A protein has these predicted regions:
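Active-site histidine-anchored catalytic micro-motif
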Residues: 2-51, 86, 92-195, 200
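Metal-dependent C-N hydrolase catalytic cores
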Residues: 3, 47-116, 286-296, 304, ...
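Glycine-centered flexibility motif
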Residues: 39, 67-70, 84-87, 153-154, ...
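A residue-level signal for conserved active-site and pocket-lining positions in enzyme catalytic cores
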Residues: 64, 178, 245
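Generic secondary-structure boundary/loop-capping signal
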Residues: 69, 79, 85, 129, ...
């Protein structure tokens, strides 16, 4: 039986790659829905991007629901300098997808899919956690029916402020609510995602895969590589969000440690900081599993295999 997942995302180059890996022909994952949230770009642009990516994948069977257009409390903030004005700059995509998002809001879709599933559902969250927190606030009972939340966000250092990673910083109040939910949470932060850089050698490898999906990924990675060289002086783009799906596909690729995680949501200086108690100094019980290392070579092998299934 396939593992049932809901992908809550803000596509986003790395979100797009995560979608492609999850929806591959031989995937052991069943995508119940894709829900979008404001983050890398506006929720309208992110929704268009999700629909376009699913079109490229040939997965028009997967419903897309538009979610929160701003965080729980503070104004919206976008990452245009990283993902471009469209949120998926680089590839040429249609301005109007082949279909529209469903009418039901994302948080309602999350609640509905979780509560009506005959097996527990995994939430894969690769953007700000606004939709997930909203669903938990509106229907707390979903926590009992969620197998895990596997998310990209946070880390022991920052990329948007000196101490905060973008996804958590956008809506720290939502993140705090999620980490206090009691649900099993698998965290893929900058500590591990910065180990998986798609450099020129990786891009050349994927260029040899002769199908439209693989070539779309190449265009995504080329844009991301340039962006990360310009803004962070890195030799490749980290495939941040894809790590969530890679873990669900092949968990042995990652070293995970149980830790207590808390989210700072009050300090103007450190808002959005993820406090990861790696050394167990607080004495608080673990509420998450935190990725610390990854088998990079096997990551590229797995992605190569998944891209070839689209031939």
């Amino acid at each position: 039986m396939k593992r049932k997942i809901i992908m809550d995302c803000d596509p986003g180059h790395d979100d797009a790659i995560a979608l492609i890996l999850a929806g591959a022909i031989d995937s052991p994952l069943e995508i119940l829905a894709v829900t979008t949230v404001a983050g890398n770009q506006s929720v309208d642009k992110n929704t268009t991007n999700a629909l376009n990516v699913l079109d490229i994948m040939g997965r028009q069977d997967i419903a897309v629901a538009k979610g929160a257009d701003r965080p729980l409390i503070k104004p919206a903030a976008f990452a245009s300098e990283i993902h471009g004005e469209s949120g998926l700059d680089g590839p040429k995509l249609p301005s109007t997808p082949s279909r529209q998002a469903v009418a039901m809001p994302a948080s309602d879709v999350i609640i509905n899919k979780v509560m009506t599933s005959d097996t527990p559902v995994t939430i894969v969250a690769t953007g700000p956690l606004t939709n997930v927190a909203t669903a938990l606030i509106r229907e707390p009972r979903i926590a009992e029916h969620i197998e895990s939340i596997t998310l990209m966000g946070g880390g022991t250092f920052g990329n948007w402020t000196p101490t905060a990673e973008f996804n958590i910083w956008v809506d720290a109040e939502a993140a705090k609510r999620v980490f206090e939910s009691g649900i099993t949470i698998n965290v893929f932060g900058l500590d591990v995602t910065h180990q998986v850089l798609a450099d020129e050698h990786v891009i050349e490898r994927f260029e040899s895969i002769n199908n439209p999906v693989a070539q779309f990924v190449v265009e995504l990675l080329q844009f991301f590589k340039k962006t990360y060289k310009t803004h962070f002086n890195m030799d490749g783009g980290p495939i941040h969000d894809a790590c969530t799906i890679l873990y669900l596909l092949q968990p042995e690729l990652f070293a995970m440690v149980p830790v207590n995680i808390d989210i700072e949501h009050q300090s103007p200086l450190t808002y959005g900081t993820m406090a990861v108690d790696l050394n167990h100094v607080t004495g608080k019980p673990a509420n998450a599993y935190f990725a610390t290392a990854v088998d990079v070579e096997e990551v590229w092998n797995l992605i190569d295999h998944k891209l070839r299934t689209y031939e």
